Every structure is written in structure tokens, then in C-alpha cells.
Amino acid sequence: MATMNTDATDKDISRFKVIFTLVVSGIECITGILGSGFITAIYGAEWARGKTLPTGDCIMLMLSFSRLLLQIWMMLENIFSLLFRIVYNQNTVYILFKVITVFLNHSNLWFAAWLKVFYCLRIANFNHPLFFLMKRKIIVLMPWLLGLSVLVSLSFSFPLSKDVFNVYVNSSIPIPSYNSTEKKYFSETNXVNLVFFYNIGIFIPLIMFILAATLLILSLKRHTLHMGSNATGSRDPSMKAHIGAIKATSYFLILYIFNAVALFLSMSNIFDTYSSWNILCKIIMAAYPXGHSIQLILGNPGLRRAWKRFQSQVPLYLKGQTL
């Protein structure tokens, strides 16, 4: 069995590293929580009023809510791993944090993948019968697909709770020069099981992303050839929709690949627990959901308008509170 082992003591992490990590990742998490919370509040309010949400908005609600949970959970894990190390390094607590983090990451990826597939089916134009069938059925099938995605994410994250992670604290490591003892934190990861369950959980949604992006590019090429040398081509709404969807998909893939690598490296214990590389992984992991939430708001005209209204109302509310 291939395993990765690390150990660390309280002396291995400086106060500067603790403060730096908490501040930087905290700013990223709070930014993401505000962005995801805003999207959740907008669509959640419409749903609470009894309105039937369009399929795209329903996916956005699921994605933003799961991402809100992910960012809150990551913030809690950073606080516990840096400030409450004895509690965090209890085997049950450590495994709980890791399993839920992977589950929320996988769920987020699935929801984002279905969002891209949905917009691909709306925007792209092909004459293939299978494409037409998917285009007609996607609205009916989407609630079932979202529920199935949660079950799949759970099925590939729950096995990580057994025979993958093992941590413990030794409180009796002697320090001869001080005639005292110090706490030492040991962690062990079964790299083979982690690689299998982690990668198989992200493989299918990543393939869906790549297929959606490929179909959009092919559809854009066909549309461009059809338009020919038409002078209004650059202002064509269909072309703008294609380009916008391709850009959004590309940005997400870049963000997610960095996040996936950082999350895997952090969980595999390749780096020492409190090394600068591990801290960098925490910062990258916090940046991904925040960055994508901002991209979703900026790329959606309705959310942009709602955000501008929100910005204009905040000063009025604060002014009223001071009177």
C-alpha cells in the first residue's frame, strides 16, 4: 500500500504564517460567501415567493448554495487546522473535514457541468437527432440529473472515510534542552485509494465540460461560416452568445484545474503540514469558488442589474441607520 506520511510540531508554524493564511484565505472565503450568498438570495427569494424558476436559474441556485456551504466549510477547516490543532488532528474530526470537502467539491463540479451543458444545448446549433432529443428533454430531466449528481458525489466521497486518512497526536515528545515535552502531529494518507476515488469523482463532469466547450466551438465555426462576410457578424447575438459561453467555460476550467491540483496535493500530505507550499494550496482552494462566483455575477445580465441595485441601496440603508 503506497502511503504518504508527514509529521509536524507546534514549532513548525510561525505566528506570521498563521495570521497570513487566515487573513488571505479569509478574505477570499468572505468574498466568495458574499458572491454565492447574493446569487442564492436572488434566486432563493424568487423560489420562496412561489415562482417556478427557469431551468438555468434552478441550476444556478443549486450551484451557488452548494458553493456557499463549501466556502463556509473551508473557512472552518482553516480555522481548526491552524488554531485548534489538537482537535483538528483527532482522526474522526480530520476525516470528517476531508470527506465533506471532497463531497462539496464534487457536487459543485457536477452542478457547474450541468449549467454549461444546459447553456450549450440552448446556444449551439446542430442537426443531429440525438442533439435535438437532448435539447427537448433536458428541462424535464434536469431535476433528476441534479439529484443523481448529489448521489454520485456522495458515493465517491464517502469511501474516503475508510482506509485513506489516519492522523494522531503524540503529546509526549521530549525536548531535552528544556526538560519538557511537545505535541507532535502525525498524518498518513493512502495515496492509491485517494487517487482512485478523487479522480473518478471528477472525471465524468470534466469530460462533460470539455464536450460542451468543443460543441460550442464547432457550432461557432459553423455559424461563422454561415454568416460569411456579413458586416453585421460581429454584432450577431448568436455569435456573442457562443463567444461568451466559450469564455465562461474556459475561465472555469482554468480555475477548477488549479483548485483540483491544490486540493489533491493538500489532502495527499505530499507537503509538510505547515509548509509554505501547503499554505499556497489553501489559498488557491479558497480562490477558486470566490473567482467563479464573481464570474457568474458578471456574466449574467440579470445578476449584474440586481448587484447594481443592491450597491445603490446599501448606502441609503446605512444613511438611514445613522439618522
From Swiss-Prot:
Which InterPro entries does UniProt cross-reference here?
TAS2R
Q: Which cellular compartments is it found in?
A: Membrane
Which parts of the sequence lie on the Cytoplasmic side of the lipid bilayer? 36-58, 122-140, 212-247, 298-323
Q: Which residues lie on this side of the membrane: Extracellular?
A: 1-14, 80-100, 163-190, 269-276
Q: Where are the transmembrane segments?
A: 15-35, 59-79, 101-121, 141-162, 191-211, 248-268, 277-297
Membrane topology of the entry: Multi-pass membrane protein
Arranged from A to Z, the UniProt key words for this protein are: G-protein coupled receptor, Glycoprotein, Membrane, Receptor, Sensory transduction, Taste, Transducer, Transmembrane, Transmembrane helix
Gene Ontology cellular component terms for the protein in this record: plasma membrane
- Read off the CDD domains from this record: 7tm_TAS2R40
GO molecular function terms listed in the Swiss-Prot or TrEMBL record: bitter taste receptor activity; G protein-coupled receptor activity
Query: Please, which domain of life does this record's source organism belong to?
Result: Eukaryota
Q: Which residues are glycosylated?
A: 170, 179
Any Pfam family the entry gives: TAS2R
Concerning its family, UniProt says: Belongs to the G-protein coupled receptor T2R family.
The record ties this protein, via PANTHER family, to:
TASTE RECEPTOR TYPE 2 (PTHR11394), TASTE RECEPTOR TYPE 2 MEMBER 40 (PTHR11394:SF47)
Any extra detail in the entry? Several bitter taste receptors are expressed in a single taste receptor cell.
Identification of the protein by name: Taste receptor type 2 member 40
